[in-house]
Amino acid sequence: MVYCNAQNNDVTQKVEGKCFDGYIFSEKYVGFNPLGDIDKFTPNESDIVKAEKILKEQIKDLNKDLLNQVGNCPVIHKKLSKYKRQYVGTKTENGDKVIWINFIWSKDKDALVKLSEEIIIVLDGCSYYWSVKVNLTTGKLFDLSINGSA
């Protein structure tokens, strides 16, 4: 079951499922966008459920190198439910729908304060902070980016 609640600012929507919790950023969002000047769309509940299903099925293989996941840093595919998410919908030149998912460790209270208001970018922090893209049209997970350590 998924629950969505519109936020007061009309730019984000709360979305929750059995193993995920986060915010959908609408195409109206004008704050900092790490994806640059792109063709955006607003994902709906079914887009997020599909993206999370693809993520769950494919992240272990995509994460086989375990980049920046040593010592005290979590192995991301084993701790998916420990991350809060931010979802941004984009479209490719071919018209494919892609969702960029930004993952923030759920115990980082400072970062979580702004989770519904702006895209959170953290430098360093190893695998406590990472992102990935999901092509909803092709069903492929790609462009895994895991923060490094200082």
Give the label of every model feature segment.
Residues M1-V11:
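Bacterial Sec-dependent N-terminal signal peptides
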Residues N9-K114:
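Surface-exposed acidic loop/strand-edge motifs in secreted or periplasmic proteins
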